[in-house]
Amino acid sequence: MHALRTTPGLGRLAFLILLGCVACACGTSSAASSRSIVALGDSVPHGQNCSCTPYPELSAGGLSKSTGKSVKATNDSVSGYTSTNVLAQLKDNTNVIDHVRAADAIEIEIGANDVGYNKSCGTTVSCYTPHMPALKENLAAIVKRVKELTAGHKALVVLLDYWSVWLGGSYAKAHGDSYVAAAEEMTDQVDTAIKNAAKQSGSAYVDLRAAFKGPNYSYDETHYLSSDGDHPNAAGHQKIADATESVIEKRLGLG
């Protein structure tokens, strides 16, 4: 019996097809092992007044190290944004919509600017509380919209609150007792709204007030604040990232 001869051209073609299949398999494996985080919100996740890496990027880097998987962050937060602005982003901004659709975790920190301190209201809490119903509605709508955009795959919504929605630590104390009391009351209201939104929607919740001020909210958080007293410094962003990483890793099972 004569040995079967292989046509050189066919042999080369078969090799190229095999090589292509291997490349596709490798690409699929790489894509499957990578994860993505998208951050939405105001100047805190944006990293204002801190020449440092903001917490969304830090949390992605920390998760990459702890899990051995590639985790990348896209930071779509904008300084000055309110909950109304974030909701508009999720409805009208095609880039943000595409980012969220592909995300495995969406970090959202918003609400402080909805009740931002102003001279006309001063420390009169009742002057700010009329803004709370709209904030609560927007938080629910934001989470609902994110869940709609990520309906095709497993994704985790992470809601973060605030250590103070106004100035914090020694910066708040410098404005007097009435300012400190009003800041604490408004922070209570905003943080409660965020915590309830997380509970009602099944989202993850990160208690930054506890992270910065301890379990009883009694510690002075000044050492976590930048020079404006309103935003985190590098240590503050790392503290937020550590708290957020723990929640994401547990809820998504990235370990």
Write out the residue ranges for each language-model feature:
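Sec-exported extracytoplasmic/periplasmic mature domains
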Residues: 60, 64-68, 91, 95, ...
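Serine-esterase "nucleophile elbow" of acetyl-processing enzymes
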Residues: 28-79
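Structural recognition of the beta-strand scaffold that forms the well-ordered cores
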Residues: 36-41, 45, 72-77, 104-109, ...
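Short amphipathic alpha-helices and their capping/turn segments at secondary-structure boundaries
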Residues: 26-33, 86-104, 141-151
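Solvent-exposed loop/turn segments at secondary-structure junctions
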Residues: 43-46, 78-84, 111-117, 163-168, ...
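Catalytic His-Asp segment of secreted/periplasmic serine-dependent ester chemistry enzymes
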Residues: 163-255
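Secretory targeting and sorting signals
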Residues: 2-31
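Oxyanion-hole/transition-state-stabilizing segment in secreted/luminal serine hydrolases
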Residues: 88-133
